[in-house]
A protein has these predicted regions:
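Transmembrane-helix exit segments and adjacent C-terminal regions of multi-pass membrane proteins
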Residues: 1-12, 22, 209, 453-543
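Helix-loop-helix hairpins in multi-pass membrane proteins, especially solute transporters
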Residues: 83-231
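Interfacial helix-cap and linker-helix signal at transmembrane-aqueous boundaries
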Residues: 58-59, 89-90, 112-113, 122, ...
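Transmembrane core module of solute transporters
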Residues: 36-38, 46-57, 63, 70-75, ...
Length: 543
């Protein structure tokens, strides 16, 4: 029997033993670990929400507003790129080492953001802090592994509650620190985030002390390196990064026919095609292990989580943007409004945990969740001018879900940016001219009026021939209409994807047989389990 097969038999034996002993309650060690994991998720969401909600405050201080799309984009890209490599490395070198090292990067990156004086430095800070998001699949995996399977809905629900709390507190504190045009308050926000990252890192170091995993103990370093899917990583990186770069650049500042956009887009697409061919025809047990797709639930769940990732990042980046443009309220009010969604998330996470534990079913809450997402997107898309103010296998499952959620987020942000930029550039001129020309404004002055309104340049407005308060008011109405139409394209695109995901949810099969007392990876050996092992001969123990 090979070493790898022996390891797999050993892990299955551990699962059988934990099933025998699976009636025990959740231990204090497991509770402390779950609290630590929840703290990591809390600060990650606070970091991600801040990257979207405080974008305009950061740009107002350091400049480079055209680069601001990369604040959230770099986090989404790194989450997708690092999720599977980090998860596979954790199986080989141990969960704790990878989790602690990656989480500590969030502390360093947050300090860089807080001290930044240019947009490039801010992007670098988000890149470093984005490394911490590579541990996101581990957070879901660990919280599921250390408790009995019948308690998994509660463990996963606690993570969603922590995510909602991180978003709510982040939005409200970020709003307080930056309200009344105090844009420099973003620095204090990321100092706070850095402090929470530090506490979370120390907590994981102290409270997570799992026994060595089978592959961690048996394989040598060269063997561990060979077990990683290096070719797959090599295809995924340019496919995702270049594809997102091309969409981010389209219309901001290059046209689709420009070499910057066209070359990166083609290389990204070709790399993506190469990745698909390699993972389907050549590498059977790489990032996308073929046995994962034997059950239709997995493929359907990937599609749903991809759409959910796009929906989250759409709301995270464009809700505050649209409200600030159309309604002109301060950051605290915007944060309080958006926090309503996360309050609903926390409540629904608890209710879903109760429902799934009692019914042992998942399909209904998934369909219901996408129904509410569609409703949210449609409501945002139908905002009208009358509202505006002119002033192992389970581990492989988990890591793949997080990869596809992050892929949805990174690709979604790039797609949304392309839709919004092209929509705004194509509607800005016609909407403003349609509003001011009937009032007698000279057509030859439109070339000066449109950029002056778009950049809120009051000095340039005063120098335009034929300008008047009535013309300015009408021009602002046209400007807001152009923004509204551009936002509508983003929301409707996301709503369409959520509709497809909700339909896919009807075909999911409820895995009622999976809700058992089995604990896949206890964080410490149990003496009673050892005694059971002595009395019971389990296949694979002698391997």
């Amino acid at each position: 029997m090979s070493e790898r097969s022996s390891c797999e038999h050993g892990e299955r034996a551990n699962e059988v033993r934990s099933e025998v002993h699976g009636n025990s309650k959740v231990s204090m060690k497991s509770l402390l670990l779950l609290l630590s994991i929840n703290l990591v998720y809390f600060v990650q969401v606070a970091n991600a929400v801040g990257s979207g909600a405080l974008t305009r405050d950061i740009s107002a201080v350091v400049g480079g507003s055209h680069d601001s799309v990369w604040y959230s984009e770099v986090i989404a890209i790194l989450t997708a790129l690092l999720g599977i490599p980090a998860s596979q490395a954790a199986d080989l070198w141990g969960r704790k080492t990878i989790l602690v090292c990656l989480t500590s990067c969030g502390f360093v990156g947050s300090l860089i953001i807080a001290k930044a004086s240019s947009s490039g430095t801010v992007i670098a800070g988000f890149a470093v802090s984005g490394i911490s998001f590579g541990a996101q699949p581990l957070l879901h995996a660990i919280s599921s592994e250390v408790v009995a399977r019948k308690y998994r809905p509660w463990a996963q629900g606690s993570i969603n509650v922590s995510a909602s709390l991180g978003a709510i507190i982040g939005l409200l504190i970020g709003g307080v620190l930056t309200r009344h045009e105090h844009h420099d308050g973003f620095r204090a926000y990321w100092y706070m985030v850095a402090g929470i990252y530090a506490v979370a890192t120390v907590a994981c170091q102290f409270f997570y002390n799992p026994p060595p995993r089978a592959l961690e103990s048996v394989l040598s370093v060269p063997e561990k390196m060979r077990n990683l899917d290096w070719v797959g990583y090599g295809f995924l990186t340019p496919a995702l990064v270049l594809f997102c770069m091309s969409l981010a650049w389209s219309g901001n500042p290059y046209s689709w026919t420009d070499a910057h956009v066209l070359a990166t887009f083609l290389i990204g697409v070709l790399s993506g095609v190469a990745l698909i061919v390699y993972e389907t025809s050549i590498k059977k047990n790489g990032m996308f292990h073929h046995r994962l797709f034997r059950d239709r639930n997995f493929a359907l769940a990937l599609g749903c989580i991809f759409a959910e990732g796009m929906a989250f990042h759409c709301g995270n980046n464009y809700f505050a943007f649209e409200v600030s443009v159309l309604f002109a309220t301060d950051n605290l009010i915007i944060g309080a409004q958006y926090s309503m969604a996360f309050i609903a998330l926390g409540i629904s996470a608890i209710m879903s945990g109760i429902w799934c534990s009692i019914s042992k079913a998942l399909r209904f809450p998934i369909i219901l969740a996408f129904g509410f997402k569609i409703l949210f997107m449609v409501l945002m898309a139908t905002v009208s001018n009358s509202f505006c103010n002119t002033s192992r296998i389970d581990r492989d499952y988990i890591r793949s879900y997080d990869l596809y959620r992050s892929l949805g987020g990174s690709i979604g942000l790039a797609v949304f940016n392309a839709i919004f930029s092209n929509g705004l550039s194509s509607n800005l001129g016609p909407k403003i001219s349609h509003a001011v020309l009937p009032l007698g404004f000279p057509e030859r002055e439109l070339l000066q009026l449109i950029p002056a309104l778009a950049h809120n340049d009051t000095v340039a407005l005063k120098q335009i021939h034929g300008i008047s308060p009535e013309i300015i008011h009408a021009g602002v109405d046209g400007l807001l209409e152009a923004y509204r139409v551009s936002f509508r394209g983003v929301w409707l695109t996301t709503a369409s994807l959520c509709l497809v995901a909700s339909i896919a949810g009807f075909f999911l099969r409820d895995p009622t047989e999976k809700f058992t007392s089995q604990i896949d990876a206890p964080i410490a050996p149990d003496t009673e389990v050892v005694e059971i092992k002595k009395r019971t001969k389990i296949p694979g123990d002698s391997a």
